[in-house]
């Protein structure tokens, strides 16, 4: 069963669900991996915002993409969190290079912010909550109908429907 944490930050309650981490192939049996993935999917169903934690030492694994895709398909907010940043020596170049790799591997969620931190040393952990608040604002943001209609018309003008026999 996932572990639940209730945090109160700036007078807001946040319920954090910690699911079992995914592992690279060969480290666990396949059926355990599938069960772990199903638990993560159930946790996503119960969430508003998902924090996809990537282990910097292991890098991006296939399950990370499945989880991100499921969060996207479920209409959930998503933040990609790169943990174990304390183990990286060239931090400035690593942020740039690994963010580029994330953007390449997760092209289907270009809107998801990327946060680098270390849970162990608490380095850059202060950068996470502002991103959670920003994603939360975007989830509840309402778009005016006129703006949405204009956007749809622009898209239609750029890609009009094919005509049938010139009509």
Residue ranges and their predicted role:
Residues 1-17, 21, 27-38, 42, ...:
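C-terminal-of-GTPase-core extension/linker across diverse P-loop GTPases
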């Amino acid at each position: 069963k996932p572990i639940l944490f209730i945090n109160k930050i700036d007078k807001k309650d946040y319920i954090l669900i910690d699911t079992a981490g995914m592992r690279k192939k060969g480290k666990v049996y396949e059926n355990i991996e599938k069960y772990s993935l199903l638990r993560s999917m159930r946790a996503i169903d119960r969430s508003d915002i998902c924090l996809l934690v990537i282990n910097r030492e292991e890098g991006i694994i296939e399950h990370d993409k499945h989880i991100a895709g499921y969060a996207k398909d479920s209409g959930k907010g998503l933040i990609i969190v790169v943990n174990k940043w304390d183990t990286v020596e060239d931090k400035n170049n690593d942020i740039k290079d690994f963010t580029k790799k994330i953007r390449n591997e997760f092209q289907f969620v270009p809107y998801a912010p990327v946060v680098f931190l270390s849970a162990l040393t608490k380095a850059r952990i202060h950068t996470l909550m502002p991103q959670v608040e920003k994603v939360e604002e975007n989830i509840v943001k309402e778009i005016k109908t006129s703006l949405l209609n204009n956007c749809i018309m622009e898209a239609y003008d750029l890609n009009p429907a094919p005509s049938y026999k010139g009509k």
